[in-house]
Amino acid sequence: MNICLLGNNLTNLVLANILLKKKINVDIISQAKPSLLTNTVRTIAISNENYKFLKENIKGISNLGWPTEKIKIYSDKNKSSELFEFKNNNQKNFYLLKYSALYNLMKKNKFLKFIKLKNYNLDVIRKRNYDLIINSEQNNPITKKYFQKKIEKNYKSLAHTAIIDHKKIENKIATQIFTKKGPIAFLPLSNNQTSIVFSNNSTKLMDKLSLLQIINKYNHQYKINKISDVESVG
């Protein structure tokens, strides 16, 4: 049996793993080049309960997630005292992992193929003679054509993400600051790496230097050694 999953999101990666255990061939089709997925700086936040489920069903994933014990929320007006603090007693709030690490783990399975289709439409995919096609991607052309309203609103906003390498510290508290230009989040990946997500009212991706300037303005704990390339998320 051959099954096609549309989109390289977490839902499809988990579903693919379950299908592969049943000896079903799976293709994951998207508009992203597989080479880009190998090196992407995208990260995935997973709740404590969902991470337990993934560890039970995906071999090797237990070494990929980094635990976060608290989430602290700040405002631009008062950076020294948090507005809110979220924590779960005796358990982690969530786990953060690199999408590239999960992708590289999954692609080791010889029955799973990641395919980029330039002509991304249902007629082209049907010609590949799959027994079943599953679409769980929100913004691909097929979803927009068949499942969404024709009127689309452009809110002129973009989320910029990057990973910073920094001096080793105890790094298990996520922070988000609501600034005048938009919210910025510091999401721990390890004791020496942190994911940055900054959202603003723009349709143009920020360059590395511009994002670093924003980071430095609101960063009070990391001694940064390096910043990755910037990607958009959403």
Predicted ranges, named:
Residues 186:
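An acidic/histidine-cluster motif and surrounding catalytic segment
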Residues 48, 143-182, 190-194, 215-220, ...:
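Central beta-strand plus flanking loop segment that forms part of the substrate or channel wall
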Residues 7, 30, 75, 164, ...:
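Short beta-strand/turn micro-motifs composed of small residues
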Residues 4-8, 18-41:
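Glycine-rich FAD pyrophosphate-binding loop
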